[in-house]
Amino acid sequence: MASSIPNAPSAFNSQSYVGLRAPLRTFNFSSPQAAKIPRSQRLFVVRASDSEFEAAVVAGKVPPAPPVRPRPAAPVGTPVVPSLPLHRRPRRNRKSPALRSAFQETSISPANFVYPLFIHEGEEDTPIGAMPGCYRLGWRHGLVEEVAKARDVGVNSVVLFPKIPDALKSPTGDEAYNENGLVPRTIRLLKDKYPDLVIYTDVALDPYSSDGHDGIVREDGVIMNDETVHQLCKQAVAQAQAGADVVSPSDMMDGRVGALRAALDAEGFQHVSIMSYTAKYASSFYGPFREALDSNPRFGDKKTYQMNPANYREALTEMREDESEGADILLVKPGLPYLDIIRLLRDNSPLPIAAYQVSGEYAMIKAAGALKMIDEEKVMMESLMCLRRAGADIILTYSALQAARCLCGEKR
């Protein structure tokens, strides 16, 4: 068949088209525009059958193709050396973007992120000085808008951290299980607005404690374990009643996972998951977070219940206890400085592993980026990929929105 293409050279001879012309009669498919062009200026494209093309190639009438590319020249002065006798050259699998993408072992997507959000009772969104780009969000408006932005780029999981008024804090943290407290109210609001949003909650007393510790403090400064766990169970049940999908005990009290599982099941919340802070270290990387919630301990530190940063094998003990007590997800905190612990849990547990890229990690990247010492966006994405490579299935990160926008091709 033939079709007309306008503006062809008038001297074109269709009979010389690669030496081929279909023996059958041809058709000229003319458009109204082509009809106005003189026949002598039309190009007739003649197509032969596959067998005719093959016969032409066999006869030596090979269609033209681009020539072999010359080898790129080396810089002047480059020594001429014999090729190394290498059986394997790993660089061959890295020589092009397509090959690098094909052989990439670790991937990351917005679905891997859990977005930590700070909330407070006010209407204004208050910037957090030590965490550029993060705010204490008004629970009724700012929070809803931030969640909408995250969902637009594929982040559909959030974890809530409340700033509680000092007047509501107490030594026993009773506000933690107030069914009409800030967190339960916020959960109900978000579930009403976004029913499919996955809401994680923090289970610990430090935001509600007048002492700033994760548990009840005895007069001699000892953090009371079992009494604290009793309070945490009531807190988790209140969160589940409001609609929480995953409760996350970050307190590091012994036995709290099993107690929470029993309390939730007894109230009919068998479907609510537990993400245990399995290996939460007594780290110096938490400073900006405590500023955000005004939850610094009023005295002492948290070393009697959080793990020693020098310890590795202890994480296995915590992991086995949490598994046996019914944890659904195991979390390591902090993240990047503890990649070895993430890998340790990944290699020894079939459960999903979470990593928390904490406030100090976030602040360092932001500060260095602001000073133009690093490419903030590239370092941020590399740090998240490293957490995934180490074995984290999900990552709690304050960069969730920014990183998801990068993955979606949006500008910051």
Curated annotation (Swiss-Prot):
Main subcellular location of this protein, as a coarse class: plastid
Binding site for 5-aminolevulinate 1: R290, K302
Residue ranges, annotated region (Disordered): 68-101
Gene Ontology terms: cellular component: chloroplast; cytosol
CDD domains with a match to the protein in the record: ALAD_PBGS_aspartate_rich (cd04823)
Localization per Swiss-Prot or TrEMBL: Plastid, Chloroplast
Single GO molecular function: zinc ion binding
Catalytic activity, reaction form: 2 5-aminolevulinate = porphobilinogen + 2 H2O + H(+)
Transit peptide: 1-48
Enzyme class: lyase
GO terms, biological process: chlorophyll biosynthetic process; heme biosynthetic process; protoporphyrinogen IX biosynthetic process
Binding site for 5-aminolevulinate 2: S359, Y398
Binding site for Mg(2+): E318
Record field: compositional bias (Basic residues): 86-97
Active site feature: K280 (schiff-base intermediate with substrate), K333 (schiff-base intermediate with substrate)
Tissue: Leaves and root nodules.
Pathway listed: Porphyrin-containing compound metabolism; protoporphyrin-IX biosynthesis; coproporphyrinogen-III from 5-aminolevulinate: step 1/4
NCBIfam families the record matches: PRK09283.1
Known partners and oligomeric status: Homooctamer.
Function summary: Is committed to plant tetrapyrrole synthesis. Catalyzes an early step in the biosynthesis of tetrapyrroles. Binds two molecules of 5-aminolevulinate per subunit, each at a distinct site, and catalyzes their condensation to form porphobilinogen.
Similarity comment: family membership: Belongs to the ALAD family.
Name this polypeptide is given: Delta-aminolevulinic acid dehydratase, chloroplastic
Organism: Glycine max (Soybean)
